[in-house]
């Protein structure tokens, strides 16, 4: 014991000497003990104890050497979040690093492994005393490293339909009438969860009152919009229902009895299964600076770690109708973080989002991280809504440059984000909101139910703190699953000067195709007031509705892109579609040097909408020229134009040119290198070259590095489309 008392001071004294090449090291091992001194021979057993040792080291004086906490392979259970404050900071010269040391994974787990299951017919069952006593519950379950769905009706991919909203009329947000046989007076009615899908978001509800005779259900929380909105009869399913436990992979927790029931998948055995239930809700690792006090978590690095097993927060008053699910939190959540790094980490089995650098975060880096199996989205950068006049959310400030605490100069590079949106279906692969100078590059994003990348985040049309963001060389594909609508491979919102979307490869975007409401799945989508954005050298193909769509906006430049094999379904289904508002100055848009390759022949549309912004006179809001149009099915190419209440005018190219568009454009086979194999580079003799259109090489989009990392997406199993 005497040796243990003196070793740490000896280490610390040596660290106070500024000799060159020195480093402070602590060790953590599952076989360690927190009463030990944290050396390789006598490691700690918890990361929090090592964190305290770093603080003790700092308390003796300014760091003069880098500090490394070496974490040996194994699983480290956590009953509460690991919180880093300004007291845990390093410096530029002496960062503090928490890293994996040795072969094998290091897992920071917010869950508890469950053992002792018994076979009961086709199910495995386990009685959990803490659940029966009311001390623990969970709404997520992870088996052999993958999330399993809670028992639901109807089963995954299918839905019931709302009959009518309650209360009746436009304000029906508290409940609805349901169809015969869809809902029952289940024994655990207070624990049942209704999940309702609208266009771009979903809401989660607990039951307040059920009237089986009149087939009505009322909820403890209201929906963000009426249940009659969008398509009149929204889709929904009911989760955590014992009677819904009817197919392999599902599970049900009876809180009254404390019994967990699991329907195993074929091939799963009790002898080698790992079943983990989360103890920690929402956030596992927290970087908690104090921006208002000018104190930040700085120069802390995390290398080679896995963070797993959190729950979702589903209170009875949950309000979660925000676009992009920005009400939810993340497994790794940062406020007031600067110069922090997550590299070569895996973030998985999260109840909500994966990673979020939120308020006042500067110069942080997320690189080569594998973020997957998520209740929500992947990686979020920036802040929630900032409404206001000119300076959104910051009243009293006269110019954007003086607004405090803006998130800026952050980078998300070379990350693989996939298999998300399991609970909060309107979440994003990588989201950038009210942030500036963000770089999102070389990421692969797939198997998400909503948009791949979103950037901007203001509806007002005023200046915002979102500007100079770069979205480049990302590979975004197999998203939507025909589950969510009003989405895109890349989606923007609001005025974003200096923002560039370039050299991205986007394909297999499949939006929900409503039988009554509008349908929009786009390759690239500039929504509400998007302005001052450059869209250049992107390739978008195999998209359900529009290759490119702009919904009001000004001074956007769409240059040298390929929009190919666009299905062009529905009224918004066109190769390129431009809208503006009469009475609103949505001017200065340019679409030049693009190739539109549409099987249906629906090439381009420009419309000025009459609406709440006033009628006004028609005006030129977009310059469209020097483009190449072609139908791979040799269909007649059509172009459409409309102004306010005027009837839609359909043209061939000649009529379209007489209306003032595409004067130097052509209809011709662009002679792609191999469109059947989705190679849309330009082959020899392409007529596009005569118009100054350059061939686009998509090979650099997505991940880079060693073959094991670059090939990792090849093992991804994409979810099936919803059956609606």
Task: Give the location of each predicted region.
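Core nucleic-acid recognition elements
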Residues: 365
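N-terminal secretory signal peptides that target proteins for export/translocation
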Residues: 1-3
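Bacterial N-terminal signal peptides
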Residues: 6-18
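Glycine- and acidic/polar-rich repeat regions and solenoidal domains
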Residues: 81, 312-334, 348, 352-362, ...
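Extracellular polysaccharide-degrading/modifying enzymes targeting complex plant/algal/animal polysaccharides
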Residues: 27-348, 387-404, 645-668, 676-723
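Boundary at the C-terminal end of the N-terminal hydrophobic targeting segment
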Residues: 21-24
């Amino acid at each position: 014991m005497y040796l243990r008392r003196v070793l740490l001071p000896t280490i610390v004294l040596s660290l106070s000497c500024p000799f060159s090449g020195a480093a402070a090291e602590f060790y953590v091992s599952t076989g360690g003990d927190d009463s030990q001194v944290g050396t390789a021979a006598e490691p700690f057993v918890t990361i929090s104890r090592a964190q305290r040792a770093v603080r003790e080291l700092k308390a003796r004086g300014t760091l003069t050497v880098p500090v490394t906490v070496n974490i040996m392979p194994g699983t480290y259970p956590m009953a509460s979040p690991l919180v880093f404050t300004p007291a845990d900071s390093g410096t530029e010269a002496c960062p503090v690093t928490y890293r994996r040391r040795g072969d094998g994974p290091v897992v920071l787990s917010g869950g508890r492994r469950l053992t002792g299951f018994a076979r009961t017919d086709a199910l495995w069952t386990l009685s959990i005393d803490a659940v029966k006593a009311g001390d623990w519950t969970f709404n997520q379950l992870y088996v052999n490293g993958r999330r399993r769905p809670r028992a639901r009706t109807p089963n995954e991919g299918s839905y019931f339909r709302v009959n009518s909203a309650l209360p009746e009329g436009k304000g029906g947000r508290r409940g609805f009438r349901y169809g015969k046989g869809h809902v029952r007076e289940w024994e655990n009615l207070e624990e049942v969860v209704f999940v309702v899908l609208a266009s771009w978001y979903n809401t989660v509800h607990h039951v307040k009152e059920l009237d089986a005779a009149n087939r009505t259900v009322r909820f403890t929380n209201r929906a963000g919009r009426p249940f009659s909105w969008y398509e009149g009869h929204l889709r929904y399913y009911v989760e955590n229902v014992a009677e819904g436990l009817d197919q392999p992979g599902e599970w049900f927790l009876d809180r009254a009895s404390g019994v967990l029931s699991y329907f195993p998948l074929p091939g799963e055995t009790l002898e080698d299964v790992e079943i983990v239930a989360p103890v920690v809700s929402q956030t596992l690792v927290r970087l908690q600076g104090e921006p208002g006090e000018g104190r930040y978590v700085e120069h802390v690095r995390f290398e080679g770690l896995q963070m797993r097993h959190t729950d979702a927060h589903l209170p009875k008053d949950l309000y979660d109708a925000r676009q992009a699910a920005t009400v939810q939190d993340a497994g790794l959540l940062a406020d007031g973080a600067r110069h922090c790094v997550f590299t070569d980490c895996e973030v998985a089995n999260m109840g909500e989002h994966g990673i979020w650098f939120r308020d006042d975060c500067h110069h942080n880096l997320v690189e080569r991280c594998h973020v997957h199996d998520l209740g929500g989205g992947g990686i979020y950068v920036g802040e929630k809504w900032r409404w206001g006049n000119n300076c959104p959310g910051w009243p009293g400030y006269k110019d954007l440059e003086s607004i405090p605490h803006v998130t800026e100069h952050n980078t998300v590079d070379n990350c693989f984000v996939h298999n998300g949106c399991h609970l909060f279906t309107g979440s994003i692969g990588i989201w950038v909101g009210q942030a500036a100078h963000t770089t999102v590059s070389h990421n692969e994003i797939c198997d998400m139910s909503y948009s791949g990348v979103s950037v901007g985040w203001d509806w007002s049309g005023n200046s915002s703190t979102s500007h100079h963001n770069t979205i480049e060389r990302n590979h975004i594909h197999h998203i939507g699953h025909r589950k969510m609508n009003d989405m895109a491979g890349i989606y923007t919102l609001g005025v974003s000067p200096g923002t560039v979307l370039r050299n991205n490869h986007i394909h297999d975007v499949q939006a929900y195709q409503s039988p009554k409401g509008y349908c929009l799945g786009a390759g690239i989508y500039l929504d509400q007031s998007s302005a001052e954005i450059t869209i250049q050298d992107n390739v978008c193909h195999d998209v359900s509705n529009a290759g490119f769509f702009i919904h009001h906006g000004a001074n956007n430049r769409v240059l040298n892109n390929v929009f190919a094999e666009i299905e062009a379904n529905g009224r918004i289904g066109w190769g390129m579609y431009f809208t503006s508002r009469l009475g609103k100055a949505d001017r200065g848009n340019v679409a030049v040097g693009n190739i539109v390759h549409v099987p249906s022949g629906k090439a381009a549309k420009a419309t000025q909408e009459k609406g709440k912004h006033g009628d006004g006179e028609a005006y030129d809001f977009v310059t469209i020229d020097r483009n190449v149009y072609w139908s791979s099915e040799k269909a007649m190419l059509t172009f459409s134009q409309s102004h306010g209440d005027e009837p839609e005018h359909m043209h061939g190219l000649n009529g379209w040119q007489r209306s003032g568009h595409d004067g130097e454009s052509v209809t011709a086979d662009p002679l792609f290198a191999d469109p059947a194999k989705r190679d849309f580079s330009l082959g020899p003799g392409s007529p596009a070259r005569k118009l100054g259109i350059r061939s686009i090489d998509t090979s650099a989009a997505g991940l880079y590095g060693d073959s094991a990392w670059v090939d990792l997406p090849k093992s991804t199993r994409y979810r099936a489309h919803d059956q609606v």
